[in-house]
Amino acid sequence: KGRCEKPVPKINMKPFTKKIVLENGREFYGYGFGADREVINEIVFNTSMVGYQEIMSDPSYTDQMVVMTYPLIGNYGMADEDYETKTPTIGGMIVREYNDSPSNFRYTKTLNEVFEEHDIPAIWGVDTRTLTRIIRNEGTQKVIITGADTPLEEALRKVREYALPHDMVSRVSCKKRWMSRVPNHKYDVVAVDCGIKYNIIRQLNRVGCNVTVVPFDSTLEEIMAFRPDGVVLSNGPGNPQDVTPVIELVRQLRGKLPIFGICMGHQLISLAYGAKTVKM
């Protein structure tokens, strides 16, 4: 039997609607928001005090359940200019307190509305401090968001039988190249899209770079045809060892152009040069 982290209800407190069950048998009760459906993902945590919009729209969190350690989420809403991708692919979100009445002159939607729009489940009212310590001490594991009345044995069976997805880069990478240009540019850069965040492109533009974004499986010949001054390998989800096209591309680019990697891109460069990557 797993341990149950079920807060003592206050007088007139509405009944819990959802719960999460970890692969280790621990369960935590709370209230659902966003999409009203069951979901199983890998659980991770993020310690940022602000930036939940950038986190939920970061392709690096594809099919992951993100625990937000900062206790108040949703209070400044969602602004159209702050997304890191057009279509968020985060698996879900777990928060301590959710605020559905944002105060921010820039906001256009609430976090709940965006989660509903993109069919992303979330839960609030959870003891995220305890949950984060479990992840820190035991490592990432699978988790389910399910109804509060789902039997523990049933939820555990679903979690333990579920196989986590692979090859997520092909899912989030662009299917055809696109460009982001600036006037009086200084450099031409090719960005290999493994799940690129818009802010990487914005920052490259800011320092005078025209950016051509290409799919992760682009060939050396296709990239060299743009006559770039350098190549950027983006962030992305999943295991970098699965992204063999980019690893091979780095080996072919070696000595030809400057190469810069961010997050997964950095790991892909390391793998191409013979290093090993290990899941933390």
Q: Where on the chain are the PLM-derived regions?
A:
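Cysteine-nucleophile active-site neighborhood
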Residues: 229-280
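RNA-binding accessory domains that recognize and position tRNA/RNA substrates
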Residues: 11-188, 192-226, 240
